[in-house]
A protein has these predicted regions:
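A composition/biophysics-driven feature that prefers long, compositionally simple stretches
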Residues: 1-105
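Structured loop/turn residues at beta-strand edges in well-structured enzyme cores
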Residues: 13, 43, 108, 167, ...
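A broad detector of the eukaryotic-type serine/threonine protein kinase catalytic domain
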Residues: 23, 53, 82-85, 111-115, ...
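Short catalytic-site patches enriched in acidic/histidine residues
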Residues: 81-85, 90, 121-188
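Active-site pocket-lining segments that scaffold enzyme catalytic pockets across diverse folds
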Residues: 103-113, 123, 131
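Contiguous, non-catalytic segments that form substrate-binding/exosite surfaces or channel walls
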Residues: 118
Length: 188
């Protein structure tokens, strides 16, 4: 169940039953379609597990979620975090190859850091050039670049890069979450 803008993309995957609605719809932004789908697939006494743990997100307004729960009752939405985590731990050979390809992109970009990071180069410029290197090495997109630099170490890695130029003795740290073919790498 997705907004209609994703129909073409989802049509290329292995899922054959893709249901869509015209979004955005301020009156019913897919909630009735999702409720109808769930009630058609899950028996009235059934439970629907969704991830509720770390790194999970509710991608709908909370009011819509509460409305969905009412519409699908007596079915219950329960915490399926453990089950989802167990499934995610198991990777096919194809997934492993995709993860390796994503990591290879980051590895190649890190190998290029000496091309653009050096004494006198502002940290903000290093960040931008690093993102460019990731894209040039094959990333489809760069979800984030974080890092820091400072004499003998760095103070934090969550502040935005600034225009302070790198100096001799600075330790530079870069962290990225580049994506290739839908697979992320987390590389420091």
């Amino acid at each position: 169940v997705i907004p209609s803008i994703g129909t073409e993309l989802m049509g290329r995957c292995w899922i054959s039953d893709v249901r869509t609605w015209n979004a955005p719809d301020p009156v019913d932004d897919g909630v009735s379609l999702l409720a109808d789908t769930l009630t058609g697939l899950v028996p009235a006494s059934g439970r629907i597990g969704i991830p509720m743990g770390l790194e999970s997100h509710l991608r709908m307004p909370v009011a819509d979620f509460h409305g969905l729960q009412k519409r699908i009752a007596p079915r219950q939405i329960v915490d399926g975090t453990d089950a989802v985590y167990r499934v995610r731990e198991i990777k096919s050979e194809a997934e492993i190859a995709k993860i390796r390809a994503s990591c290879a992109v980051a590895d190649a970009a890190f190998d290029r850091v000496p091309e653009f990071a050096g004494q006198g180069v502002p940290l903000a410029r290093v960040f931008r050039d690093f993102q460019v290197a990731l894209l040039q090495e094959g990333a489809d997109w760069v979800s984030y670049v974080a890092g820091g630099a400072g004499p003998g170490g760095y103070g934090d890695v969550i502040s935005p890069a600034d225009e302070r130029p790198l100096q001799t003795g600075d330790v530079l740290m870069l962290d990225t979450g580049a994506v290739r073919d839908g697979y992320f790498c987390d590389f420091d």
